[in-house]
Amino acid sequence: MALPVYYDKDIDLGVIQSLQVGIIGYGVQGEAQALNLRDSKVKVRIGLYQGSLSVSKAKKEGFEVLGVKELVQQSDVIMALLPDELHKEVLEKEVIPFLKEGQIIGFAHGFSVHFNQVVLPKGVGAILVAPKGPGSALREEYLKNRGLYHLIAIEQESSIHNAKAVALSYAKAMGGGRMGVLETSFKEECESDLFGEQAVLCGGLEAIVRMGFETLIKAGYPEELAYFECVHEVKLVADLLHYKGVEGLRKHISNTAEFGAIKAREPMGNLLEKRMQKILKKIQNGAFAKDFLLEKSLNYPRLNTERKALKETKIEQIGEILRAPFNHKK
């Protein structure tokens, strides 16, 4: 089913320009959104905790910085641009008790709302405005008079403002209307985003890359060649996929590579499909969210162990050497 798509010509920028926006958090995404909004003539303030390392940076870039509670009390639209696992703790203590009927709270990812980490008062709007890319790309594309695709969704209507109109206007102010703003739901955005991260973009890709590298190493091939063939050249293929699609990728590789891809897909396809279905099921039934929130409550033991172990792997050690010339050029 095709999603509704909105462009600049369909959206009233004046809606968000007439409101006071408060952004909680000033990481890469928070900074990019704040800068884009300000350049689109939107009134923006930043909410941070006393002692936050981001306070000086936000002030240096010309933003008024308030405490989170104060920001909530002085804003029409509050964007919670914090890590997913912090939403419950921060919003329950510093945001929800001070919300007034008619205000709108926004999210860049549906995790905390969809998995019931956050329950909002009646009359308070809940919107999703999700740029499809990192904060660095969001800012870079805006400055080039381009934009990223954006997703919007409405979970709860505001008693004063039209939540959809606000979400669309916010997305336009960030440059989303230049590319396209697609309307979905918190559920669909959250589950598809988690699945993409786990099965393909982060988990799946990393697993294939590392297994490919280890397979060649165990078979006696030099680490440098294994790295080039299984890691380094991923960017070339990813760029072709991004700009040309699957068919375009096929047209830009050799017959040998294309035929080899088809032959390799046959034994891998069924196994991958079954594994991916299991991953999706655990996302849909809340098992992944439960595991992740438990990990957070224990202070991330598995993440910390994995991060430490990764530094000692051959793929990282040879990779650091081979990436050095690229990093030096920067």
Curated annotation (Swiss-Prot):
An example Gene Ontology CC term for this record: cytosol
UniProt: substrate binding residues: S254
Binding site for Mg(2+) 2: D193, E229, E233
Keywords annotated in UniProt: Amino-acid biosynthesis, Branched-chain amino acid biosynthesis, Magnesium, Metal-binding, NADP, Oxidoreductase
Catalytic activity entry: (2R)-2,3-dihydroxy-3-methylbutanoate + NADP(+) = (2S)-2-acetolactate + NADPH + H(+); (2R,3R)-2,3-dihydroxy-3-methylpentanoate + NADP(+) = (S)-2-ethyl-2-hydroxy-3-oxobutanoate + NADPH + H(+)
Any one GO molecular function term: ketol-acid reductoisomerase activity
Sequence ranges assigned to domain KARI C-terminal knotted in this UniProt record: 185-329
Enzyme class: oxidoreductase
Family: Belongs to the ketol-acid reductoisomerase family.
Protein name in UniProt: Ketol-acid reductoisomerase (NADP(+))
Taxonomic source organism: Helicobacter pylori (strain J99 / ATCC 700824)
Gene that this polypeptide is encoded by: ilvC
